[in-house]
Amino acid sequence: MSKPAFDYRNVLQNLPTLPGVYRMLDAAGKVLYVGKAIDLKRRVSSYFQKNDLSPRIQLMVRQIASIETTVTRSEAEALILENNLIKALAPRYNILFRDDKSYPYLMFSGHAFPQMAYYRGEPKKPNQYFGPYPNGYAVRESIQILQKVFRLRTCEDAVFANRSRPCLLYQIKRCSGPCVDHISKEEYAADVASAVAFLNGRQSELINELTRRMTAAAEAMAFEQAAELRDQIQALARVQEKQFVASNQSQQDCDVVAARVRDGVPCVNLVMIRGGRHLGDKSHFPIGGEADTEQEILEAFIGQHYQHAGVPAALVVNGVVDDALQQFLQERAGRKVYIVGNPIGERRVWLEMAEKNAELAILQRLGSKATQAQRLAQLNEVLELEDAGRFECFDISHTMGEATVASCVVYDKGAMQPTEYRRFNITTAAPGDDYAAMREVLSRRYGKLAEGEGRLPDAVFIDGGKGQVGVALEVLGELGLNLPIVGIAKGEERKPGLETLILPYLEKTLQLRQDHPALHLIQTVRDEAHRFAITGHRARRAKARTSSTLEDIPGIGAKRRQQLLTRFGGLRGVATASVDDLAQVEGISRTLAEKIYNALH
């Protein structure tokens, strides 16, 4: 190992033998690596005394110019600080998992007739939450089951408050119609309680209670109610056969965490068991960690994932969890957390499946990378570029010149990079002038990049024909940027696969066969630019139409506009309301109601 670029001996002799966190910095002051230690002096010294460091860490050590340390009261506290710093600083040589604070939940609102809904974000009172679930599909599947069995409402409160007759879900027996008083508050509350029991894993208890209620209804000759309860029992039995695991052990909430590294690709598969239900799994791929062991990958995932996610009663893992990590989990949970590193029986089966799922996810990732590499190589060949890997694509979206929005999407490192996408609200171009809109977005984007604020692409894709490409050439020329520009002109009848590529730097046009890998990559990037532009345009248009239509009326500000939209479930509801209906809204006088009605008709 080559000699470090700074006097590490002087640093080491002043380090304490206490627990804490250390940060390795390069000559520019950028953090290269963050680590924790029970003994800072011993741990940091090991980087300069060992000869068995991985190539990745050896490369990091050669760049160290300074070391900073923070002393903590315990190793568990050091672990928390380490993970917070890794999240905040994203050091190049750390294993970094993407933040999964946005795991979905199933929510029951705090309404008198609770709404059942899919929810992402921080839980809020007085709503009741179940989860988190590993993916959105698992939440939606649970909602469908609960709709079918317990017929709970899923509509927004504004819609619920303004219905005069039951909706389609009531007609197909997926809702009990509380909006039109087809079920009492007490009966609906009983259905919600049954759904909660189901989600908490009390299936046998729930079936016994429903059976008791069915018998009582039959004895009271309430045969219609008895038939509904019978249908619920049968539906629950079918779900139980499909989704629930059998052992008492499985009734405990549990996460199964399996780390695998294959061909330099690390992956962690997370399986969630809640209330006896197998909710599904999700594979996580860290940034970095290619040369790390499965044990290091496992520890990094647990430390980062449970910073925000709920900690279950038990974790089943395919490695060893040290005492500091277990203490951290228990402090997060506020109770004992069991770590099972050598499971038996059913849990062993779960762990083996998680390991297999991680390996399959790696194979898929490797296959995808190979496909992307092939597409990229073919793209470089047909565009006559050398090792180009970063592309930016621009598109313009508007409706008859209204609410024009431009998008810029980025393809890099063999994949789309959503965190680098940008939208631009076009303000200087005349409505419908796509050339002026393109000039504005390119000037704004590359004006900053030309000054060194960010990384330039290897080529620029323009969703448009010769006119748009001409504008791009002018703008980049004015900025002194010599970047290859590729125009993607829509083919005959705008059919995919018939696009013509305009290549001004080669002074030619090109039409690839429909199954050409390079064309597939171009279409992927172009379609993403189109999607990103049109979603931004629709949002801007909707906001403009809603705001201007109501707020242009004298006497209507933001607060009253929101009251009207909430009361009537949107602008369409306000437009169909009568003067009498409008006047019933708090703060809306009869005179103002007439003004609103006249403005919208």
Swiss-Prot record:
InterPro entries: GIY-YIG_endonuc, GIY-YIG_endonuc_sf, GIY-YIG_UvrC_Cho, Hlx-hairpin-Hlx_DNA-bd_motif, RuvA_2-like, UVR_dom, UVR_dom_sf, UvrABC_protein_C
GO biological process, one term: nucleotide-excision repair
Localization annotation: Cytoplasm
UniProt domain UVR: residue ranges: 204-239
Principal subcellular localization: cytoplasm
GO molecular-function term, one example from the UniProt record: excinuclease ABC activity
Gene Ontology CC annotations of this record: cytoplasm; excinuclease repair complex
UniProt domain GIY-YIG: residue ranges: 17-95
Domain of life: Bacteria
Keywords from the named record: Cytoplasm, DNA damage, DNA excision, DNA repair, Excision nuclease, SOS response
Family to which this protein belongs: Belongs to the UvrC family.
Subunit structure: Interacts with UvrB in an incision complex.
Function: The UvrABC repair system catalyzes the recognition and processing of DNA lesions. UvrC both incises the 5' and 3' sides of the lesion. The N-terminal half is responsible for the 3' incision and the C-terminal half is responsible for the 5' incision.
Protein name in the entry: UvrABC system protein C
UniProt lineage: Bacteria, Pseudomonadati, Pseudomonadota, Betaproteobacteria, Neisseriales
